[in-house]
Amino acid sequence: MNDLIFFPLALVMALAIIASAALPGKDRLACGSVSGAGTNYQTILVEGNDLCRMNASGQSELQRQEADGKITAISIAAGAGLLGDRPDRNPHFRLAADLETQFAGHQIKVTIVARPSDERGASVFQANYSAGQEGNSGWKTFRMMPDYKEYSFLWDVPPRGAGETAVDYLAIRPVVPSKVRSIDVKSVRFDRIRKTPAS
């Protein structure tokens, strides 16, 4: 083989091997904190593959529902008496620092699209927006319809000083009177409604 062909071809093959080794997670979902990524912070929507950002804290179990290789919903299951009161010790979305900063000092509307799971479905679920040591919304309770429906609540996120961050979470859990109960969450939306008046 001619050197003019062999060496460039060998270089291309070597670069392809290095690139495939350096990017082992290139097909994995980018799961982590929920972030606005510099977009319009008036509305943040978590749906589809972004649902992988939910953490199964506490003694809970998450299961992805998929169609055509994409997440369509996430099932949250828990046993009776196994979840504590702290939002970060329950199934939750962790909000990134950019959302903490943008939401601080504002009224936020949280809208969750959910339903009882087909198996062991809960009839009631709860949600809690926590701003860490700054406080939380308390557990908001919703009685569900059989099909997907929107459930919303408002909360005034406490203001923070410049450069000050907390650890914000949105926790979502089934209410479990006995045995195990499960809910399906299709999407979560955060709407920044207005700046909270100074007290």
Language-model features: locations:
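Extracellular carbohydrate-recognition regions
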Residues: 7-9, 13-67, 197-199
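Short carbohydrate-recognition loop motifs
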Residues: 65-89, 143
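Short beta-strand and strand-turn-strand segments in soluble, beta-rich domains
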Residues: 90-92, 130-139
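Extra-cytoplasmic beta-strand recognition segments
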Residues: 95-120
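Trp-centered recognition loops
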Residues: 107-109, 113, 146-153, 183
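Beta-strand acidic-aromatic groove motif in beta-rich domains, primarily in extracellular
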Residues: 119-130
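Extracellular carbohydrate recognition and processing domains
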Residues: 134-167, 178
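Extracellular beta-strand ligand-recognition surfaces/modules
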Residues: 156-197
